[in-house]
Regions:
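Short regulatory "switch" loops immediately downstream of catalytic or recognition motifs
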Residues: 127-132, 158-160, 177-178
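Short, conserved beta-strand segments within well-ordered enzyme catalytic domains
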Residues: 124, 153-155, 172-174
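Extended, Lys/Arg-enriched charged tracts that mediate electrostatic binding to polyanionic substrates
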Residues: 143-162, 168-169
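Sequence context surrounding c-type heme c attachment/ligation sites in exported
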Residues: 1-56, 161-239
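Sequence/structural signature of beta-propeller domains
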Residues: 1-150
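Residue-level preference for alpha-helix termini and adjacent loops
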Residues: 112, 122, 157, 232-234
Length: 239
């Protein structure tokens, strides 16, 4: 019953992007005292860690010949330098194009404001496998168990309805992998889109970055129109 309530009610909540209540200095007269700096200790791996794949292995898997309309499924075990090497999209230069293989576009039933970016999500389940719904003892903590080799892709783009253009900023991949010891884990990869020699290419950039972005569009839910730009759109560090 809890899950049904969540699924049927949350999409009806209004979208609110008014930042005014969060401008503490203007609204309440002062900002909160800053928190002490966070010191992150040096990373210490836990358990048995597989050696990193060799450059030769990465090159072999990422540059493999792939049939038209299929994804490069075998490459899920490595971090390809370019997003197009996974063959996830029908148009390698457009992550909003139809997905290859068994890719299934999906949307979330909860709203998440992402700095005026438009988001595209696609789930790729390996052939012969399936994602299994786990009811979590029949409560709101239900989850989906994805098989090894699953790739979840999420692209952030900026839309200009006046010019009828859309610019892809980044595509994030989450890939389910397995160690030689049988441990399952998810790896997050950050790909940043660039234009080179008239072509759009997304490069693996785990350290993230900063870019300029502009938007001009109307929200289909609220009807509100948003227009603006920034020179400091932050592309996240994958770590």
């Amino acid at each position: 019953e809890d899950l049904i309530d969540i699924v049927t009610s949350l999409p009806n909540f209004p979208v609110d992007t008014d930042i005014t209540p969060h401008l503490c200095d203007e609204t309440y007269g002062s900002n909160m005292a800053p928190l002490p700096p966070i010191v992150i200790p040096e990373f210490e791996p836990s358990g048995t860690i597989d050696p990193a794949p060799s450059d030769a292995m990465i090159d072999q898997l990422c540059n493999a010949t792939v049939a038209a309309g299929e994804i490069n499924a075998a490459a899920y075990t490595v971090d390809c330098p370019r997003l197009d090497q996974y063959h996830l999209f029908a148009d390698a230069e457009d992550p909003s194009s139809l997905p290859n293989g068994q890719g299934v576009p999906f949307v979330m039933n909860t709203k998440l404001f992402s700095d005026y970016a438009t988001k595209y999500r696609v789930a790729y389940i390996p052939k012969g496998e399936q994602a299994i719904y786990r009811d979590g003892n029949d409560n709101a903590n239900a989850a989906i168990l994805f098989p090894v080799g699953t790739i979840l892709a999420k692209t952030f783009s900026f839309t200009n309805e006046t010019n009828q253009t859309e610019v892809a900023a980044e595509t994030r991949l989450i890939i389910k992998r397995e160690t030689s010891g049988g441990q399952y884990y998810w790896d997050g990869l950050e790909y940043i889109w660039k234009e080179e020699n008239g072509e759009k290419v997304a490069y693996l950039t785990q350290q993230g970055g900063v870019m300029s972005a502009s938007w001009d569009y109307s929200d289909v839910k609220s009807g509100d129109h948003y227009q603006g730009s920034t020179d400091a759109y932050v592309l996240p560090n994958a770590n």
